[in-house]
Amino acid sequence: LRSRGLGDVYKRQYPSSFLTLPDGMKENFYWIQMYKLASATRGDRALIDNTGPWLTVTPWPNAWWNLNVQLTYWALNASNHLDLAASLENAIYNNIENLKKNVPEAYRKDALAIGRSSNLVCESGEIGIPGVDKAAEVGLLPWACHSLWLIYRHKMDDELLRNKLFPVLKQAINYYLHFTYKGKDGKIHLPQTYSPEYGSAEDCNFDLALLSWGCRTLLEITGRLNIDDPLIPRWKTILEELTPFPTDPANGLMIGRDVPYAFSHRHYSHLLAAYPLYLINKENPEEYDLIEKSLLYWQGKSG
């Protein structure tokens, strides 16, 4: 804080996020996070990748979109720092052409995507094709759109919603729409995709949750903004006919159809329907039991 300019930054930063907690350790942790985030980005600068501005030797020197970016930005909403969250908005909204190039060429007309890791302008290389490439990790931009949705919900800026978020979310969900199919059971299914850092499965819970959330959110947006989009019937059909989340009677949510959660992993991608998407909710007694069972099994796995 010897630099007057830097001192002014933190004088502005801390009052905006002021919070006291009865537990001193938790309060200290909170303030450390606020300091870290203020050190790592500005609204008009690069998004926060795995190392931020600190140069260090690491196997992960990029922006990783399968968990890291999303979790990093959550803290900025409720802490009253949408000014810093703008770095994520700008990274996505200002790099649409790069997001288009991340999609295999045959689908670039109406779809956007981002791969597991990218540079600071969202160039990741082409993502996989569901049902063709075993590691087709296709839900990462929809998950990033959930972070953009949370930012919008704290701003409630409908011009931003109409001109920025809606087009990106629509095209992110469009990639799924190229591959959904109706099974003999009359339900809509997804071919094999990749659950982040775990493995591949048909009807992958990670992707079913994001597809469902995306369609629900697109319908909410079109209703709010009175947008008469030609895909509205398709989104409604998906919500009505999408196959249920694959579950195990004893252990809860699975990775996907016929693929159990069998070994320990910190990524909780198969649980996105419960959190942060809230497609299943603890207020429903049956869903509460499913959430509790799934969490206990996920946390109880060792190895």
Over which residues does each language-model region extend?
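Short, glycine/acidic-rich hinge or "gate" loops at secondary-structure transitions
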Residues: 44-53, 161-164, 181-190, 227-231
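Active-site core of glycosidic bond-cleaving carbohydrate-active enzymes
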Residues: 65-102, 109, 122-129, 133-159, ...
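Acidic/histidine-rich catalytic neighborhood
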Residues: 171-224
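Carbohydrate-binding/catalytic loop surfaces
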Residues: 51-63, 108-131, 187-206, 252-265
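Structured secondary-structure scaffolds
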Residues: 19-94, 108-109
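Alpha-helical scaffold segments in carbohydrate-active enzymes
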Residues: 28-39, 91-94, 98, 167-179, ...
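Secretory-pathway/luminal and periplasmic proteins that interact with or process carbohydrate-rich
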Residues: 37-46, 59-65, 84, 97-102, ...
